[in-house]
Amino acid sequence: MKVKKLVVVSMLSSIAFVLMLLNFPFPGLPDYLKIDFSDVPAIIAILIYGPLAGIAVEAIKNVLQYIIQGSMAGVPVGQVANFIAGTLFILPTAFLFKKLNSAKGLAVSLLLGTAAMTILMSILNYVLILPAYTWFLHSPALSDSALKTAVVAGILPFNMIKGIVITVVFSLIFIKLKPWIEQQRSAHIH
């Protein structure tokens, strides 16, 4: 069973990496903020195997992305930010879906994940991530007002939109995937 779990998590990580490459900017937001659907395989991993599997998918896709594409900052600041955002987004599903085992429960848990990702990534970008980018890029530090503007006009709406879009997309495909996910989960438990 451990081999099967390893294979499934590896396959989901590979799919997540490919989905990460198929990103697109959202109109009206800064071009460096791109939406992708790479959190979908991590949600599937969580529903089948639990939180550690979902976190593993988030980690592996970002490591692969850094190895293959690198980072404009030279260090994986963006990948770390993506890992944190993805983990914040998917973790409520790991804990709430077990209690609310339904499509409605899934939507509620993903919307809570959207709220967690939006709020905490806004704070982390203000305090840590955006200052790290400027430091590693050897750019002048952003003023307090520039940081606030970047977060309020870019980061906050981006994470909210991304979470809502992924929630809607996953909720729609969940209807078709639910029997397969339940079959995989019951095979994992037994």
Curated annotation (Swiss-Prot):
Deletion phenotype: Abolishes riboflavin uptake, cell growth less inhibited by roseoflavin.
GO CC annotations, alphabetized: plasma membrane
Compartments reported by the entry: Cell membrane
Induction record: Induced by riboflavin deficiency.
Transmembrane segments annotated in the record for this chain: 6-26, 40-60, 77-97, 110-130, 155-175
Keyword annotations from UniProtKB, A to Z: Cell membrane, Membrane, Transmembrane, Transmembrane helix, Transport
Residues in the Cytoplasmic compartment per record: 27-39, 98-109, 176-190
Entry membrane topology: Multi-pass membrane protein
Activity regulation as described: Inhibited by excess of riboflavin or FMN. Also inhibited by protonophores such as CCCP and FCCP or in the absence of glucose.
Keyword GTP-binding applies: no
Segments in the Extracellular topological domain: 1-5, 61-76, 131-154
UniProt keyword Cell membrane present: yes
Complexes and interactors: Forms a stable energy-coupling factor (ECF) transporter complex composed of a membrane-embedded substrate-binding protein (S component), 2 ATP-binding proteins (A component) and 2 transmembrane proteins (T component). May be able to interact with more than 1 S component at a time.
Family in the record: Belongs to the prokaryotic riboflavin transporter (P-RFT) (TC 2.A.87) family.
Job of this protein: Mediates uptake of riboflavin and roseoflavin, a toxic riboflavin analog; may also transport FMN. Probably a riboflavin-binding protein that interacts with the energy-coupling factor (ECF) ABC-transporter complex. Unlike classic ABC transporters this ECF transporter provides the energy necessary to transport a number of different substrates. The substrates themselves are bound by transmembrane, not extracytoplasmic soluble proteins.
PANTHER family (alphabetical): RIBOFLAVIN TRANSPORTER RIBU
Protein name, entry field: Riboflavin transporter FmnP
Organism of origin: Bacillus subtilis (strain 168)
Gene: fmnP
